[in-house]
Regions:
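N-terminal targeting leaders of membrane proteins
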Residues: 1-49, 88-107, 129, 145, ...
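Hydrophobic alpha-helical membrane-anchor/signal-helix detector
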Residues: 10-31, 51-70, 112-127, 140-157
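Alpha-helical membrane-embedding segments
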Residues: 73-84, 110-124, 172-183
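Membrane-helix boundary connector in multi-pass membrane proteins
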Residues: 126-136
């Protein structure tokens, strides 16, 4: 991907309805846990929190999925697994918040872009959050929240086709998942046959 493609992808992610929706959810949790200081209570406080949560996510997306990947030559895309056990796929989706592919080698490496971008977004949030909460604690807290949002998004990308097929009888992958599962099953069968072959050769005639 070129630098402009990465920034464009980050912008589309930042204005996706999912990003707005998760900001409203985060704002709801924030208001439920707050003591009434800072943003305050009620509709006004809730919408202030929603706006701040969205800015956190927007900054994290643009910096962690756009600017830093362009500078560090890291691929910000999520590469869906689509087959294997639930546990394996879930852990894979979570890990992609902290691991990514390098542009040139295609090998997995620490996702400095995403982690660094989320921390920077957390630091920027001190500019528009109430002064009572500003500081290192706020930076870390908001950085972790943005990281969790991205992790949840990765899990959703991984399992949404499964959910869609189950609930709506629609396959967003147009059969690619079925092909991947078939290939995975064939590989497991071949591995099992290869393991059994030496045992058969050792049996006396």
């Amino acid at each position: 991907m070129t630098a402009s493609q990465k920034i464009g992808l980050a912008f589309r992610s930042a204005i996706d309805p999912y990003t707005f929706g998760i900001a409203f959810v985060v704002a709801g949790f924030s208001e439920a846990q707050d003591n009434g200081t800072g943003f305050g209570w009620g509709p006004e406080g809730y919408f202030k929190r929603s706006g701040a949560a969205y800015l956190d996510a927007f900054d994290g997306a643009m910096i962690g999925n756009g600017l830093l990947p362009a500078l560090l030559h890291q691929d910000p895309r999520y590469f869906r697994l689509g087959h294997g056990t639930f546990r394996h796929r879930f852990l894979y989706a979570v890990a992609t918040s902290f691991m990514c592919k390098h542009d040139n080698t295609g090998k997995w490496e620490p996702n400095y872009s995403n982690v660094g971008g989320n921390i920077i977004a957390g630091a920027i949030s001190n500019l528009y959050y109430p002064s009572q909460t500003a500081g290192a604690g706020q930076t870390i807290n908001n950085g972790l929240i943005v990281t969790f949002e991205g992790t949840f998004g990765g899990v959703l990308q991984e399992f949404w086709p499964d959910i869609s097929r189950k609930l709506f009888r629609k396959d967003p992958t147009h059969g690619l998942d079925a092909q991947a599962r078939a290939a995975d099953a064939a590989a497991k069968l071949k591995k099992q046959q290869d393991q059994n072959q030496p045992q058969q050769n050792q049996n006396p005639k």
